[in-house]
Amino acid sequence: MRSGLFGVLRWTAVGLVATLVASLALTACSGSAAGEIVYVVDGALGTYNTNTIVGAASAGAQAFARTLIGFGYHGPDGQIVADHDFGTITVVGGVPLVLDYQIADNAVYSDGKQVTCDDLVLTWAAQSGRFPGFDAATQAGYRDIANIECLAGQKKSRVFFVPDRSVVDYEQLFAATSMMPSHVIADQLNIDVTEALLTHNATLVEQIARLWNTTWDLKPAVDLRRFPSSGPYKIESVLNGGAVVLVANDRWWGLKATTKRITVRPQEADIQDRVNNRSVDVVDVAVGSSGSLATPDNYARIDSPSAGIEQLIFAPQGLLAAAAARRALALCTPRDVVARDAGLSIANSRLSPATEDAIAAADGAREAGQFSKADPAAAHDALSGETLPVRIGYQGPNARLAATVGTIAKACAVAGISVSSVTLDSSTDPSGPQALRDGKIDVLLASTGGATGSGSSGSSSMDAYDLHTGNGNNLSGYANAQVDNNIGALAVSADPAERVRLLADSAPVLWADMPTLPLYRQQRMLLMSKTMYAVTRNPTRWGAGWNMDRWALVR
């Protein structure tokens, strides 16, 4: 989503107001500001790099939105807000699109190394699809960049887009959590990363990709020198059980973090006990994932729609690789019941999923009609009377998704489809997408991109790449030239009429091939202490963590 001057001013004002409110609260209340806040998120925190397939599906973006910053961040409505603490973007040319990126002169990592244009080059190379070996979640936007001019060690770069590929939502690129510290890889390999990438040195590119994929994996006793921060917080430690402790970054050049320490903890089965004994302060998870979580008197709860769609994502291999098998499971899935149990309407859109508007509502509505209610007879016929065992997996614990699998299993049994539920424990199976890729399950029940949380970038044209050939989080391995062309066209079109045409052209193909089955829009629950200040919702995968450096808890 592009943000105009009004949007930038509006959300800059929101940040200032949040800071002012927190300051006034601390002044007015008899209590004092807490030194630590405990923040509970949906999924695992297995990597610092939220741009890998596993990282994008994790809760990493919620945790590290103010640890690895960029030229923009996602505000409370999911829109991009320019982050001038980090730098500025200037449009130099429109056709083709040319952008100048200027990193702030005082931008420095927590280890003392400068933030430079080398970080942009690595970000582009890893996610452009042009360099082999990178396990990137998405190529959206980056694949349309033709070249980046960067003198190693400098703070300015010029980005040239491919002619006729003026990406509408270019502000999504090089934003918070997208830019990893390239000097960490440069120091490990003792090379100039920018030179190696821009000269396409195949041997070095392979080594760079391997480290980009793995060097930022998080585990207890990890070498924290590999995890420098460019934001108000930095990692202090990784705890047993997967929690990550963030502390104020003393080298941060902007407004200092209000709270000095935030422990980010993945949701566990004992969440109700933790809330009851006030050992957690902010809970930012999918509605229903924690069951019927009771809200104590000293907590406030806000539910709101996310930009992500809960869906069935079919494996590219095994029994569900065949379109007939996928359609059979879709035919017996009672989407109306599943959505009703979640208190929601059925979602149909695959290529316009991030927002609830007239365009998204119309996307695929006609083609989806036969898949709204369970039709076990049609499912049986689609399989020619054969039986079909199906393993549906989801990241647990998650009461809502467990119930959904049970509903599908009951409805599909009549059709000869035996559905078994597979709970993926974050301690042993940290990634639903990885389990799907490894063949441990036939279907992944998750949100956009296979995420436990929202999973969405906040931009429908970016999220649509989940079904583009070769995209990392195209978990079903779907490939269709017509759909690819339409996804590419959506990324460069701001014309509503053209977008409607492209969606209408894609819907019959997608509902026939059935790479995924959308169910309903994931709802988010934000539960917090009544003495918490400046915590606000966010429909994207960055969640409430988008402004955690402004949070204040009064004891």
UniProtKB/Swiss-Prot annotation:
Question: What does the UniProt keyword field contain?
Answer: Cell membrane, Lipoprotein, Membrane, Palmitate, Signal
According to the Swiss-Prot or TrEMBL entry, at which residues is a lipid covalently attached (S-diacylglycerol cysteine)? C29
Q: Where is the lipid attached (N-palmitoyl cysteine)?
A: C29
Q: Which residues form a coiled coil?
A: none
Give the molecular function GO annotations. Answer: peptide transmembrane transporter activity
- Pfam families, A to Z: SBP_bac_5
Q: Which family does it belong to?
A: To M.tuberculosis Rv2585c and M.bovis Mb2616c.
Q: What protein name does the entry list?
A: Uncharacterized lipoprotein ML0489
